[in-house]
C-alpha cells in the first residue's frame, strides 16, 4: 500500500491521526507510527487510531483489566437513566502512542474514534459499542456536540511516587484499563514538565501516565499530564477519569453538587461521572481534516 486515506482530529486538543483500515490490511509497525506522528516529517499527532472492522462472528479483543461483562464480550448491564445496551461492537480501535507503542485504551481517542464513525456514516448517532483492548466500550454520540465514553470504573491500587526533576511527588496508582499515577499538589505551575517523570519500575513495570492535579473549587480540578510514549499532552481522557476517581474517594477534595467532576486541562474541559461499574467521560471531539498519506515518502524521510 503506497497511499492510504487519513483523517486528523482532536479531543480537547489531544490530537490523533485516524487511519481507516476496515479490512485490516495496513502493516502499522512502530517505525511507521513514529514517522506519521512526527510533527516535522509526518502529519504530527499524539497517537494513531486505526479503524478495523470486526467480523460478524468475531468478538472484540479483551484483556485483563476489563470488567467481567466486557471480558465476555457483553455490554455492561443498563442502570437507571441509561438506555439499553447494543449487542456487539462492529468496529475495533487499534490505538498506538506516538512512540509506536501499543496502548490498552485512550479515553480521548475513543471519543474521537466514535465521532468519526458517526460522521462517516459507519454508525448511526446514539449509543453503540467500540471494540478496544480492554473490551467493548459503550459510547454516546449525538449528531453534533460532545461525545461520551463509558469506560470501566477506575481501580485504585495504593500509593506510588514520581520524581519530577529532583522533586518527589507522592500519589495514587490507578488503573483505567491503562496505568496512571495521580499526584495532588498545591500549585501546578511549581512542577517542572520539561523532562519525563521518573517512576519506580516495581510499581509501574510498563510505565504509566502521570497526572498532576490542583484543586480549583468544589467539583473542579486542574490537571496536567505526562503520557507514557508521548510526553506532556494538552489532555488525557483516561487520566481525567483517574483523577476524578482519586477525588471521589478523598475527603479533603470538595465534591461536585451535580455529580459531574470538571477536569480542566490545557486543551479545554472534560466532565466525569460515576455510575456503578462504569465512568462517563464527556467532552468535545472533532474531525478537522482528511487526505491521503504517502507511505513511501514517509519511509524515505530522514530519522
Swiss-Prot record:
<keyword id="KW-0028">Amino-acid biosynthesis</keyword>
<feature type="binding site">
    <location>
        <position position="209"/>
    </location>
    <ligand>
        <name>substrate</name>
    </ligand>
</feature>
<feature type="binding site">
    <location>
        <begin position="107"/>
        <end position="108"/>
    </location>
    <ligand>
        <name>substrate</name>
    </ligand>
</feature>
<dbReference type="GO" id="GO:0005829">
    <property type="term" value="C:cytosol"/>
</dbReference>
<feature type="site" description="Could be important to modulate the pK values of the two catalytic cysteine residues">
    <location>
        <position position="180"/>
    </location>
</feature>
<feature type="binding site">
    <location>
        <position position="97"/>
    </location>
    <ligand>
        <name>substrate</name>
    </ligand>
</feature>
<dbReference type="Pfam" id="PF01678">
    <property type="entry name" value="DAP_epimerase"/>
</dbReference>
<keyword id="KW-0457">Lysine biosynthesis</keyword>
<feature type="compositionally biased region" description="Pro residues">
    <location>
        <begin position="75"/>
        <end position="86"/>
    </location>
</feature>
<dbReference type="GO" id="GO:0008837">
    <property type="term" value="F:diaminopimelate epimerase activity"/>
</dbReference>
<feature type="binding site">
    <location>
        <begin position="237"/>
        <end position="238"/>
    </location>
    <ligand>
        <name>substrate</name>
    </ligand>
</feature>
<comment type="pathway">
    <text>Amino-acid biosynthesis; L-lysine biosynthesis via DAP pathway; DL-2,6-diaminopimelate from LL-2,6-diaminopimelate: step 1/1.</text>
</comment>
<feature type="compositionally biased region" description="Low complexity">
    <location>
        <begin position="60"/>
        <end position="74"/>
    </location>
</feature>
<dbReference type="GO" id="GO:0009089">
    <property type="term" value="P:lysine biosynthetic process via diaminopimelate"/>
</dbReference>
<dbReference type="InterPro" id="IPR001653">
    <property type="entry name" value="DAP_epimerase_DapF"/>
</dbReference>
<keyword id="KW-0413">Isomerase</keyword>
<comment type="function">
    <text>Catalyzes the stereoinversion of LL-2,6-diaminopimelate (L,L-DAP) to meso-diaminopimelate (meso-DAP), a precursor of L-lysine and an essential component of the bacterial peptidoglycan.</text>
</comment>
<feature type="binding site">
    <location>
        <begin position="227"/>
        <end position="228"/>
    </location>
    <ligand>
        <name>substrate</name>
    </ligand>
</feature>
<keyword id="KW-0963">Cytoplasm</keyword>
<comment type="subunit">
    <text>Homodimer.</text>
</comment>
<feature type="active site" description="Proton donor">
    <location>
        <position position="106"/>
    </location>
</feature>
<feature type="region of interest" description="Disordered">
    <location>
        <begin position="60"/>
        <end position="86"/>
    </location>
</feature>
<feature type="binding site">
    <location>
        <position position="178"/>
    </location>
    <ligand>
        <name>substrate</name>
    </ligand>
</feature>
<feature type="binding site">
    <location>
        <position position="14"/>
    </location>
    <ligand>
        <name>substrate</name>
    </ligand>
</feature>
<comment type="similarity">
    <text>Belongs to the diaminopimelate epimerase family.</text>
</comment>
<dbReference type="InterPro" id="IPR018510">
    <property type="entry name" value="DAP_epimerase_AS"/>
</dbReference>
<protein>
    <recommendedName>
        <fullName>Diaminopimelate epimerase</fullName>
        <ecNumber>5.1.1.7</ecNumber>
    </recommendedName>
</protein>
<feature type="site" description="Could be important to modulate the pK values of the two catalytic cysteine residues">
    <location>
        <position position="227"/>
    </location>
</feature>
<feature type="active site" description="Proton acceptor">
    <location>
        <position position="236"/>
    </location>
</feature>
